[in-house]
UniProtKB/Swiss-Prot annotation:
Listed EC numbers: 2.1.1.184
Biased composition annotated in UniProt, kind: Basic and acidic residues: 26-41
Classification via PROSITE patterns: RRNA_A_DIMETH (PS01131), SAM_RNA_A_N6_MT (PS51689)
Annotated GO MF terms: 23S rRNA (adenine(2085)-N(6))-dimethyltransferase activity; RNA binding; rRNA (adenine-N6,N6-)-dimethyltransferase activity
KW Cytoplasm (keyword) present: no
InterPro entries referenced in this protein's UniProt entry, alphabetically: KsgA/Erm (IPR001737), rRNA_Ade_Mease_Trfase_CS (IPR020596), rRNA_Ade_methylase_Trfase_N (IPR020598), SAM-dependent_MTases_sf (IPR029063)
Region (Disordered): 1-59
GO CC annotations on file: cytosol
Catalysis performed (reactions): adenosine(2085) in 23S rRNA + 2 S-adenosyl-L-methionine = N(6)-dimethyladenosine(2085) in 23S rRNA + 2 S-adenosyl-L-homocysteine + 2 H(+)
Record's protein name: rRNA adenine N-6-methyltransferase
Organism: Streptomyces fradiae (Streptomyces roseoflavus)
Gene name of the encoded protein: ermSF
Family: Belongs to the class I-like SAM-binding methyltransferase superfamily. rRNA adenine N(6)-methyltransferase family.
Length: 319
């Protein structure tokens, strides 16, 4: 994970909420931005014996802790979350509580998760009074938390390095209504088609989840200043899925075949499982050229292709 450079300016407020150095799965990580760079034994301040030999600065970097410098940004994010009035809201990565404070008026109950044990006492002190009786601070790894049985919204200024795991958790949660994350801008743009290209994850989950980019947050809003800007990513679980549950397995198999890259085009990949006539008809219905590369096919075009092809049985292997 890339080390965030130090800001040339002092932070505007001590009340801060977390943002994070660049996100990096093995597939999406830019060269030289790996987590191991932050874990070098030559990192400054590594001689402290606290926290198992980690200095507070090193622990902060390993937990992807960069903090929002202005409360106004947290309030902007909170307005975009829009949880159900009186409903349950979970926050992942409470940090020092700035976003928590901004979210609290918008929900009936708020459970704020924070993995860093050093931040928990201050959080519990800040939200322990009667004004925040509906707020509960939860320590530990959010990814180990059980999914609520009741409908809930999810929000957070999440670690770039843990974005994939947190997003997967949200997508698997059957009672989720929406998730609103501040995360790496590149990731948010990639997942929402903002580059004009669409990812496998977005297309695969589109029948049940809508992905949107709600805005961006400048890197200058964080202290220390990270290398990249952040985006506000919104994932909404559809009240009425675009496909019936019985069709999802076939849809997922078609999408995975299409993203296999065999033949260099979506048509060539799908031709392995479908006859030319029905496939040509599906491409005409979706207004797709046979030479189109899979990344440039929108989720709605995928659905048109699938709905046109679904009555057609796949060819047996080898034919």
């Amino acid at each position: 994970m890339a080390r965030a450079p130090r800001s040339p300016h002092p932070a505007r407020s001590r009340e801060t909420s977390r943002a994070h150095p660049p996100y990096g799965t093995r597939a999406d990580r830019a060269p030289g931005r790996g987590r191991d760079r932050d874990r070098s034994p030559d990192s400054p301040g590594n001689t402290s014996s606290r926290d198992g030999g980690r200095s507070p600065d090193r622990a902060r970097r390993e937990l992807s802790q960069n903090f929002l410098a202005r409360r106004a940004v947290a309030e902007r994010v909170a307005r975009l979350v829009r949880p159900a009035p009186g409903g349950l809201l979970l926050e992942v990565g409470a940090g020092r509580g700035v976003l928590t404070e901004a979210l609290a008026p918008y929900c009936g109950r708020l459970v704020a998760h924070e993995i860093d044990p050093r931040l928990l006492p201050a959080l519990r002190d800040r939200f322990g009074g009667p004004h925040h009786a509906h707020v509960r601070i939860s320590g530990g790894d959010f990814l180990a938390a059980p999914v609520p049985r009741e409908p809930f919204a999810l929000a957070g200024n999440i670690p770039y390095s843990r974005t994939a795991g947190i997003v997967d958790w949200a997508l698997r949660a059957r009672t989720l209504t929406s998730a609103t994350f501040v995360t790496q801008l590149e990731y948010a743009r990639k997942r929402t088609g903002d580059y004009g290209r669409w990812s496998l994850l977005t297309v695969r989950t589109w029948p049940r989840h809508e992905w949107r980019l709600l805005g961006r947050v400048s890197r200058r809003e964080f202290r220390p200043v990270p290398r990249v800007d952040s985006g506000i990513l919104r994932i909404e679980r559809r009240e009425r899925p675009l496909l019936p549950s019985a069709a999802l397995g076939d849809y997922h198999r078609m999408v995975e075949l299409g993203f296999s890259g065999v033949g260099g085009s979506l048509y060539a990949s799908l031709r392995r499982a479908h006859r030319a006539g029905p496939l040509d008809a599906a491409f005409r219905a979706a207004r797709l050229d046979r030479s189109v590369v899979v990344a440039y096919v929108t989720p709605e075009q995928w659905l048109t292709v699938f709905r046109t092809l679904r009555p057609v049985r796949s060819r047996p292997a080898g034919r």
